[in-house]
């Protein structure tokens, strides 16, 4: 415990301690005068000098002091920004693969340039990871001036980037992008048909901004690339009508565990309704094996109705269900719940039910970022998750002192009996702040609550802005102006992370709006000066009013999210205030608070509208939050342990796939040998081979199924052992494939290698998709093994390994089957030959072609009967 306390709260707790960091900062400062005397060309040429030193044997640690000093001087010249000493400390922490906990407004964006520049000197690339496209684009353009001045290339990847743009960006020295784009590029690269079409170049060093959001909050959400699967979507609507007819006695809901299930009475009622609708066979039970799929429909419909709320967990936008991120409050467009839950929500909202998807490729952020050779991160809130950062990612969290002491006042919570009383008190508090022109940022946990508060403020005549997933387009502008005198901003958890709230307003953001219609440079300059002067006057007004006031309307499950909201106020020594208003009807206290506390509050005889402030209440709330945090950590640990098993298999499959892409030819001997061994073992039960019809006929039948040719029984008559049979079949397969290869020599060009590689890749992808689906099914029910006193994780490892061996064998068999049955038309058109040659260089020339469309080679056949055979 002592070591943990030192690690979390000792602000310079690394290496030799405080002196280690102070000494480095002192050495950097000592170089400042000399560097300031250099010309721009002399300063900016330091990069090539540093690379020469690295090539001569020096390390990045050796270059830390001069490199940081050069970056600071460059930032001063090109951006008029100079790194503070505490920012240098943050940069050192990042270089040493730590998490730098820096308060809001302390300049994390600028800090990242120090470690990114130093790391980029190796030439292997540095990835600076942000939470959204806006920040990635902004930071790459803003901080890119520093890197470019120093002769380094800077790239940016957003959701709209093309493959060509992505490949160019990954080749840059420093890349800014989001965690989602990086993760999906990794998955997409491992679905490509050629190395040339892959965009990523390796995993060297990642600096993760808002590291708690990416590595903690999103750790439970896997990255999934999916494709449609054939399943009756109409059933979701029919089952939805059935669930609507249920009464509270028919089901039980456990909000704490996010589960809903039928009671005994409910199961009987559902069974009768399903029978009357003809959805299950007469005489069968709801829980019979044959009805397990129908039970799945019912279960997901029940979850959709009883556990997921519109405007809290999701919104309906343009006829689609769009998921709301529970931690940021942002829309997660393009994301869909898996396992039929999204379809159940669409049926619940009476929307068009889209087809269900199956997983084509998946990974988790935990395993993705652990592939990097080096990783570090920045956030304003890391201390509460220090154990998890260390245990999962081997990252130490380090608190960086603020440049100026924090002046924000954090008031005690006010607790009310009902939610109605709480919101009335919140409105009264906002009105009082508004009277003295104190800007107020009101944090809510859902769209529904933010719009309720908006209605109440409108009735009181208070002008305000609302920032939630419905109105996210002007997020940066709204947050940037939330510090103007008398401004009232209602925001969900999204609250503009990455955008500072400047007291008095942000003149740059105001200028974008005010100057849009002015074309004269002189007028624009004069207007901008007016805006700067106005924001300075407004700042004085806000400071006199007490700075930005933060109002929390509910405690989040995680203390860290609450701290993030508080952290919007009091930036860089500004005054500020924060206060939370709670009620006994809030989800946290209702679901996780102890009954003892609730009983105690009721015994106090609180009157309507009366608030209570007591250390016991504060401690009870903190205990409830710790309880939820511990539960969520356990969930993430469990998910990681299971995904580690899948990740090992993912690495095996991706490595085998890359080996195929990296080699022009492939030796199929191992493949058909394993197929033949399995074939003979299934048919010949004894050590010795019996050429009787009972053994010979099944053997020949299997040979025909796999190789597509009739084998004469006489060929096997003189064989005596299983090994001899396998040996003969190996020779037979080798001869067959050599003949096939000869058939694929056309007009002097050998097309066999391309065709064989395409068969290998498509077959492996197909089997991996099926394997992922099987692993998902196994994982869903594996916890039931604990009833039999078995360790679910160990059982999962054993069965997953067995399934992998079976999958690889089926893959070998599929490849041999396809290669044996392939044909090449002798009168192939020039277009066909061109497409073969093009495909040998990378991406498929047939990508995007439906299997039932006519083949583009001009044969007139359907694609699936022509060149589509290479896509199977």
From Swiss-Prot:
Pfam families: P-loop_SecA (PF21090), SEC-C (PF02810), SecA_DEAD (PF07517), SecA_PP_bind (PF01043), SecA_SW (PF07516)
Annotated ATP binding sites: 87, 105-109, 500
CDD domains xrefs: DEXDc_SecA, SF2_C_secA
Keyword DNA-binding: no
Membrane-related topology note: Peripheral membrane protein
Name listed for the protein in its UniProt record: Protein translocase subunit SecA
GO cellular component, one term: cell envelope Sec protein transport complex
Domain of life: Bacteria
UniProt similarity note: Belongs to the SecA family.
Catalytic reactions on record: ATP + H2O + cellular proteinSide 1 = ADP + phosphate + cellular proteinSide 2
Gene Ontology annotations of biological process type: intracellular protein transmembrane transport; protein import; protein targeting; protein transport by the Sec complex
SMART domains linked: SecA_DEAD (SM00957), SecA_PP_bind (SM00958)
Organism for this UniProt entry: Anaplasma marginale (strain St. Maries)
The enzyme's E.C. designation: 7.4.2.8
Subunit structure: Monomer and homodimer. Part of the essential Sec protein translocation apparatus which comprises SecA, SecYEG and auxiliary proteins SecDF-YajC and YidC.
Known cofactor(s): Zn(2+)
Molecular function per GO: ATP binding; metal ion binding; protein-exporting ATPase activity
Matching InterPro entries: Helicase_ATP-bd (IPR014001), Helicase_C-like (IPR001650), P-loop_NTPase (IPR027417), SEC_C_motif (IPR004027), SecA (IPR000185), SecA_CS (IPR020937), SecA_DEAD (IPR011115), SecA_motor_DEAD (IPR014018)
Annotated binding of Zn(2+), by residue: 855, 857, 866-867
